[in-house]
């Protein structure tokens, strides 16, 4: 079984949320949208988890960082 999967189904390819919905500009003030791409600990989720394209992952990262600087999103969640 060189390189084969053990049982189960083949993984479904993730589709970029932004290209599928026709979103070209990611606004740092749209906190509800940005929260979908941040973990419960406050960390930015990677592409392999969210399925976003490289272009939109870069835009998303900049929007989240700008939103954090403007205190719209927390840097970390308190425990």
Curated annotation (Swiss-Prot):
One of its GO terms (molecular function) is structural constituent of ribosome. Keywords: Ribonucleoprotein, Ribosomal protein, RNA-binding, rRNA-binding. The keyword Metal-binding does not apply. GO terms for cellular component: cytosolic small ribosomal subunit. It holds the Pfam family Ribosomal_S18. It comes from the Bacteria. The keyword Transmembrane helix does not apply. One of its GO terms (biological process) is translation. Belongs to the bacterial ribosomal protein bS18 family. Part of the 30S ribosomal subunit. Forms a tight heterodimer with protein bS6. NCBIfam families: S18. Binds as a heterodimer with protein bS6 to the central domain of the 16S rRNA, where it helps stabilize the platform of the 30S subunit. This is Small ribosomal subunit protein bS18. The gene is rpsR.
């Amino acid at each position: 079984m060189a390189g084969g999967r053990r049982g189960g189904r083949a993984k479904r390819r993730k589709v970029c949320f932004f290209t599928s919905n026709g979103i070209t500009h990611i606004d740092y003030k749209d906190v509800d949208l940005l929260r979908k791409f941040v973990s419960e600990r406050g960390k930015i989720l990677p592409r392999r988890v969210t399925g976003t394209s490289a272009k939109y992952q870069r835009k998303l990262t900049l929007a989240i960082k700008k939103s954090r600087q403007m205190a719209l999103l927390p840097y970390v969640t308190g425990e």
